[in-house]
Amino acid sequence: MRTVSDYFGSLVFDDRVMRAKLPSDVYASLKRTIDEGASLDTHVADAVATAMRDWAVEHGATHFTHWFQPLTGVTAEKHDGFIAPSPDGGVIMEFSGKELIQGEPDASSFPSGGLRATFEARGYTAWDPTSYAFIKGHTLCIPTAFCSYSGEALDKKTPLLRSMQALNKQALRVLKLFGNEDVKCVRPCVGPEQEYFLIDKAMYEKRKDLVFCGRTLFGAKPPKGQELDDHYFGAIKPRVEAYMEDLNTELWKLGILAKTEHNEVAPSQHELAPIFSVANIATDHNQLTMEIMQKVASRHDLVCLLAEKPFAGVNGSGKHNNWYLATDTGVNLFKPGETPYENAQFLLFLCAAVQAVDNYQNLLRLSVATAGNDHRLGANEAPPAVISIFLGDELTAVLDAIETDTPYSGTEKTVLKLGVHVLPKFTRDTTDRNRTSPFAFTGNKFEFRMVGSSDSIACANIMLNAAMAETLKEFSDRLEGVSDFESALHDLIKETIKAHKRIIFNGNGYDDAWIKEATEKRGLLNLRTTPDALATVLEKKNVEMLTSLKIFSEAEIRSRYEICLENYCKTVNIEGLTMVDMARKEILPAVEAYLGDLSGTVAAKTAAVPGLACKYEKDLISKLSKLADEISDAASSLDTTLIRLKAIPDVTDAAYVIRDVVLQKMAELRVVCDEAESITADKYWPFPTYGDLLFGVR
């Protein structure tokens, strides 16, 4: 029987394969490129390409693709065969260094946000050697960046790599001040916890909203939801367990460190969490994970829903972005050590994170802004739209002591005794967890909990890296060259705490009183919707920071603003059109059919027994008739609004109409349709109900 270690990474051209397949000088040169960013010589690229091709062909590959992440939010690929004609009329397998390093896909059909006209079709893909190539099916996939003919980034990987480069530069400056001359590189490491729903494929195919939108737009509340908390960490059902086993195997073959799996809070909701990896690799792996989750689900006659809010009335899905900074010498810069009060380097990086989040709240919020995530944030199941940091009692007390120049006595670790002799004693952590916080310190990392389940983690990590890099730059500028480093460091930490402690909140983020305190007393931002959040990227401070660090150009910032707003508008427009279609073609005919049979029942009963009241049937007929009229009116009103929306030329104006008008009309249509569902006999309802969907996988 094969063990996981026998096949883990078997479809990845990783360091083990490179060491075995490449000449020693070529391997050493490529490692310098990967580890230090050194340029790659042509002869090295040719040698790597040959070895990569031979290895891929051995594993059954016939094609290669430059695998990239355009601004659509999903991955893209164009497959080219290895074959080339030979003089004898046959074919040989070829793959050159040039084909490895650079590709030229048509860029005209990808979102550009005005960076290029449709007729300007040329785009380039460039190999990212820090992310290993892998085989998917019969295709060698080469992770790449994607840019326009004139050099603007048209993808999510390029600015992520730029942000990592900026963060590395500034973090090294700070570490040198503490005498860390041996550190050559600082990298952000990420572990995204992926939540998802699994539903029966046959039921999925009967619902237009799921097929077109990935989430339900109608659905009356079933008798049972998540009230009993019996699904969270519950026994995994056989069909789901078989899916998870298959999924793990596929992910492990691709070198993805899938580690933890469990049932989540809502019925049919689950989670998959990997071990941490460097941010750009974690981003690639998460994109692959989402793709494979959906493919594997289909093999099991299931559908994997990645939408943030696929069902009303139960928890939605997020993607907790666990983030820390690590040196190439193996040090986690967010690890407090045994005595955080005395760990000056840790305290400086901690304060940098606090200042970064406070100064750039809006960038963090907009990094997770989508139409789907708007339904989740602030809904007492996910963090509120107000950004705050949870540090826990011990670290907060440490910072308070520094701010007030008072002694800190420390928090002793206590042993928990459960009162049963056979059970082990264990040490209690000095910090609890706060599941309501958007940005929580959890012992040696920060957990950014606002990312949507279907979203790429690239944008969130770009903004985290950028804000941190800018803050570390400010700290380095102040500390470099000072005559008394310890005194200057103490003053900087103290001033940072005093200036930015408003962002620290260890309480209940779901409490309405907190939102009031945050906005009215602390002056924190409450950007509740995507249009509100996206607009802040154009603020002068944000543009200057992102451009000065060379993460984005001004044109790239503007383009992303346009693309994200367009995506918001198109997403909601599709949902609105789907609601109108379902209401008119499915829900109203079902209600009318039931009304017809009810009327026939009344006629038959009164004919058989003249004078019968038939109160139940007549009351139901009256209610359903009224609801049918209201459904028709609400569908027409929404349809008219969507038609008018098409005539609005400016995407910003359209987004605000959607926020203020369209979403309200969609909600009004849903209310009456859901009410009709609740009093219509099951056999008449035209598609599976919430009860069917949420409890249909056994």
Residue ranges and their predicted role:
Residues 8-120:
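Active-site core of metal-dependent hydrolases
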Residues 121-306, 315-318, 325-562:
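Glycine-rich, acidic/polar active-site loops that bind/position phosphate-bearing ligands
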Residues 1-14, 33-35, 223-232:
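Gly-rich Lys/Arg/Thr-decorated short loops/hinges at beta-loop-alpha junctions or inter-strand turns
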Residues 44-48, 68-70, 98-99, 146, ...:
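Active-site-proximal loop/turn and secondary-structure-junction residues that shape catalytic pockets
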Residues 44, 68, 96, 274-276, ...:
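Active-site proximal loops enriched in glycine and acidic residues that flank catalytic Cys/His/Asp
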Residues 493, 498-698:
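C-terminal amphipathic alpha-helical interaction region
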Residues 73-89, 105-108, 207, 214-216, ...:
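Short linear, low-complexity motifs centered on an aromatic residue
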Residues 1-27, 41, 122-142, 442, ...:
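Catalytic pocket of metal/acid-base enzymes, prominently hydrolases
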